[in-house]
């Protein structure tokens, strides 16, 4: 199932957002309830290429944005997707801020019938780090409160906390992990995903301020290994296996489609190529492949 852009507006202005500002300026009519239902019904009938991202992936669906929770018909839309996709895992990608409203969070908990998940982005251990990345003062407090409400009100919800790693967040990663362990000590209740940022949309526009090479991020990951080991379920996205320590390689996942990845010549000599992401195509264009080293068994 595809990634579905539920709504094109957002209440954050994240410096590394993969959308361009032009996305938010589109006519929102194409994202309203009636239009969303029509698109899904056409998709289910196999009537052409309806969704652009991951249209051929089976087994799950991601509800993305913008910020999906801002959709004026958010709850009717959730009910529709759950009814038309029974038994299919659905994941809501959100900044979590609207869940700071306890009534809203409770209503979501009732509507998000399993299998259902929420992937909430956290940009740091405090407002000083998180808010400048989110582009909104007060965002950190609302996101953390939103997470608290989801933990309390939605026991059947699969909660994932996503930390996007770039120049503005990488140094704070150990502190962010410590914050999570202290604030939400039952790590069996949620998963954590550390994602090396993708170079597209606003992250490309803001390349000077967010650009991060694997050589830098891998050093911080290695230092954070004792903290990483304390989480029941922690994963790494978008990392070539040769760029992380051997202890971290089992945590790496390949989540990008083949057309968004490349295997430079050095990869042909690598013993773990088949299990590896390679390089993100846009990363390769921006930074090249000099960092890569073939792993020998």
Predicted feature descriptions by range:
Residues 1-3, 49-57, 247-254:
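N-terminal [4Fe-4S]-dependent radical SAM core
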Residues 1-42:
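Canonical Radical SAM [4Fe-4S] cluster-binding loop centered on the CxxxCxxC motif
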Residues 4, 8-11, 236, 261-264:
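Processing junctions and N-termini across compartments
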Residues 17, 231, 236-240, 279-287:
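A cross-taxonomic marker for long C-terminal extensions/tails that follow the last structured domain
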Residues 20, 24, 245-297:
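Flexible mid-to-C-terminal extensions adjoining Fe-S/redox cofactors in radical SAM and related proteins
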Residues 26-30, 121, 128-148, 152-255, ...:
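Radical SAM enzyme [4Fe-4S]-AdoMet core and its adjacent flexible, acidic
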Residues 41-62, 71-171, 181-192:
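Radical SAM/AdoMet-radical enzyme domain recognition
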Residues 65-66:
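Active-site beta-strand/loop signature of hydrolases that rely on acidic residues for catalysis
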């Amino acid at each position: 199932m595809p990634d579905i852009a539920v709504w094109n507006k957002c209440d954050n202005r994240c410096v590394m957002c993969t959308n361009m500002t032009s996305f938010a300026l589109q006519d929102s009519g194409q994202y309203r309830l009636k239009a969303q239902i029509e698109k899904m019904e056409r998709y289910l009938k196999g009537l052409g290429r309806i969704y652009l991202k991951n249209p051929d992936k089976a087994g799950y669906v991601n509800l993305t944005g913008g910020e999906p929770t801002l959709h004026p018909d958010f709850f009717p839309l959730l009910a529709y997707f759950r009814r038309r996709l029974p038994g299919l895992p659905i994941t809501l990608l959100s900044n979590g801020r609207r869940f700071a409203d306890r009534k809203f969070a409770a209503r979501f908990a009732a509507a998000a019938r399993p299998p259902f998940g929420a992937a909430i982005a956290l940009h740091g251990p405090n407002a000083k780090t998180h808010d400048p990345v989110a582009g909104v003062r007060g965002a950190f407090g609302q996101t953390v409160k939103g997470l608290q409400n989801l933990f309390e009100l939605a026991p059947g919800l699969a909660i994932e906390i996503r930390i996007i790693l770039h120049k503005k967040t990488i140094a704070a990663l150990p502190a962010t992990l410590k914050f999570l362990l202290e604030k939400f000590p039952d790590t069996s209740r949620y998963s954590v995903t550390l994602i090396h940022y993708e170079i597209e949309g606003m992250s490309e526009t803001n390349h000077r301020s967010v650009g991060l090479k694997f050589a830098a991020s891998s050093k911080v990951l290695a230092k954070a290994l004792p903290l990483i080991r304390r989480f029941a379920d922690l994963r790494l996205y978008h990392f070539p296996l040769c760029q992380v320590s051997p202890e971290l390689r089992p945590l790496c996942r390949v989540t990008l489609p083949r057309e968004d990845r490349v295997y430079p010549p050095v990869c042909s000599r690598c013993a773990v190529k088949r299990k590896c992401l390679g390089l993100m195509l846009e990363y390769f264009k921006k930074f090249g492949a000099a960092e890569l080293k073939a792993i020998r068994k």
